[in-house]
Amino acid sequence: MRTVPLFAACLLLTLMAQAEPLPRAADHSDTKMKGDREDHVAVISFWEEESTSLQDAGAGAGRRCICTTRTCRFPYRRLGTCIFQNRVYTFCC
């Protein structure tokens, strides 16, 4: 049960680190707006404690997960969705 809050905190920190700072008023008039067709990817890594069933079953020590606008590619599998700044992303592990 401690894994879910830890995972949520890692996800939040990753998404906050990738967020762009707000432009200043002077910078806003000089820059062009980017299109919405960019592929956004967030990489998240989390590890289970040694005593969990994943470790007992012989699974790897860590799992790497991403939130992407595309479909999951091998070896990742879709496990759900990520929502950031009112956009829905595919959550792949």
UniProtKB/Swiss-Prot annotation:
Propiece span(s): 20-62
Cysteine disulfide partners in this protein: C65-C93, C67-C82, C72-C92
First and last residue of the signal peptide: 1-19
Keyword Disulfide bond in record: yes
GO terms for cellular component: extracellular matrix; extracellular space
Tissue expression notes: Bone marrow.
Keywords, sorted A to Z: Antibiotic, Antimicrobial, Antiviral defense, Defensin, Disulfide bond, Fungicide, Secreted, Signal
SMART domains: Defensin_propep, DEFSN
Subcellular location: Secreted
Major site of localization recorded for this protein: secreted
A family per Pfam: Defensin_1
Domain of life from the UniProt record: Eukaryota
Family affiliation: Belongs to the alpha-defensin family.
Role according to the record: Has antibiotic, anti-fungi and antiviral activity.
The name this protein goes by in its record: Neutrophil cationic peptide 1 type B
Taxonomic lineage from the root: Eukaryota, Metazoa, Chordata, Craniata, Vertebrata
